[in-house]
Amino acid sequence: MGVKSVRFSIWFLFVVTDLVFCRTLSGDPDPCDATNQREFQKLRSDQITVLINGYSEYRIPLLQTIVASYSSSSIVSSILVLWGNPSTPDQLLDQLYQNLTQYSPGSASISLIQQSSSSLNARFLPRSSVDTRAVLICDDDVEIDQRSLEFAFSVWKSNPDRLVGTFVRSHGFDLQGKEWIYTVHPDKYSIVLTKFMMMKQDYLFEYSCKGGVEMEEMRMIVDQMRNCEDILMNFVAADRLRAGPIMVGAERVRDWGDARNEEVEERVRDVGLSSRRVEHRKRRGNCIREFHRVMGKMPLMYSYGKVVNSVGEQGLCRKAGKLVFCDRD
C-alpha cells in the first residue's frame, strides 16, 4: 500500500469514527441560519434522533444506562447528549464520552455536546446533524421500555404536527385569584413534559429562531426562571397547530427524578427542579402567566384521554363468583 493509500485509509477511519462517536464543544456556529435547515420531506421518516439533556454529575451512571437503552433501539438513528453544566471538568466529560462509546450496544451514533451555557433554551436549538423528521426531547432521569418508545413513534407518525409524550400536565384558570395556573387535571391535559417529548424537527427552528421580539422575550423568561422551556414549546406548537398534545400509554417508564421515590439516592432524585413540588408549581404558574402576557392570548388547548397500544375486552362477565373482563379466564 502506497503513502497516499495509507493517508486515505487513516483519514477515512477518522471520519467514520467521528460520525459514530463525537464529542464537541457547543453546537453549530449559527443554529438559526436558514440555509442549514433541511427540507422536511428529505429527512428520514423511519427513525428518530434522541436529544438528552444532562447536567448533574451525580446522574452520570444513570445517563449512561439510559443512552445504552436508546442506542439499542432499531428506530434510533442518533443520540445527542447535550451537557448543560459549564463547570463540569473536561476530564470527567472525557470519561463520560469514553463510557458512552464503549458500553452502548446499538448502532446509533452518539455525540456528547458540551453546551456553552446552562440555558434550558439550548435543548431546543436546531442542529444540522439531525437527519430525521422526528426528534425525542428527554431528560437524564427517565428510562422507557423499547416497545413503548416504538409505540410513541408510531403515534407521532400518524400525527406529525402534534407533541407526543408520556408525562402530561395542564394549565387552568383560578377563578378566585383570577389568574392562570399550572396544575394537574384527572381528565384532561394541555402540556407535555420534556421528560419524554416527541415532535417534528421543525419546532426546534420555530422555538429558537422565529417569533420575533415576542419569542425572544419569552425565551428570556425561561432563562430568568431557569424553568418552563417545555411549557413554552407547548405554547409554540399549540399556537401553530390550534390543537393540544397527545398522551401515549407506556408499559414501563421509570422516573428516577420523581420526588416520591423512596429508595433512590437523594443526590440523584433531588437534582431536578420538580423535586421541590410546591415551589416548582408556583414558578411554572408564573411562567404561564408571563407567556400569556407577552402573547396576549392563551394558545394552550386541552386534550382528553390517552392512546394505548392494546385493545382488550371491556365487557364484564361473572366468573367464579367475580366480575372480570369477559376475555379473561
UniProtKB/Swiss-Prot annotation:
Coiled-coil annotation reads none
> What keywords are annotated for this sequence in UniProt?
Disulfide bond, Glycoprotein, Manganese, Metal-binding, Signal, Transferase
For activity, the cofactor(s) needed are: Mn(2+)
SUPFAM superfamilies for this protein: Nucleotide-diphospho-sugar transferases
Tell me the disulfide pairings in this chain: C228-C287
Q: Does the keyword Transmembrane apply?
A: no
EC class, as a word, reads transferase
Q: Using the record, list the residue span of the signal peptide; answer none if the entry has no such feature.
A: 1-27
Glycosylation sites noted in the Swiss-Prot or TrEMBL record? N99
Residues at which Mn(2+) binds: D141
Active site per the UniProt annotation: D230
| Start and end residues of each stretch annotated as Substrate binding | 268-284
Q: Name the Gene Ontology biological process terms.
A: protein glycosylation
Q: Name one GO cellular component term.
A: membrane
Entry keyword Electron transport: no
Which pathway, per its entry? Protein modification; protein glycosylation
Record-level Gene Ontology MF annotations:
glycosyltransferase activity; metal ion binding
Residues binding substrate are 118-123, 139-141, 169, 226-230, 271-284
Entries under Pfam families matching the protein: Glyco_transf_64 (PF09258)
**EC number(s) on record?**
2.4.1.-
Task: Name the family.
Answer: Belongs to the glycosyltransferase 64 family.
This molecule's function is given as: Probable glycosyltransferase.
PANTHER family the record matches: GLYCOSYLTRANSFERASE FAMILY PROTEIN 64 C3
Q: What is the protein's name according to its record?
A: Glycosyltransferase family protein 64 C3
Q: Which organism is it from?
A: Arabidopsis thaliana (Mouse-ear cress)
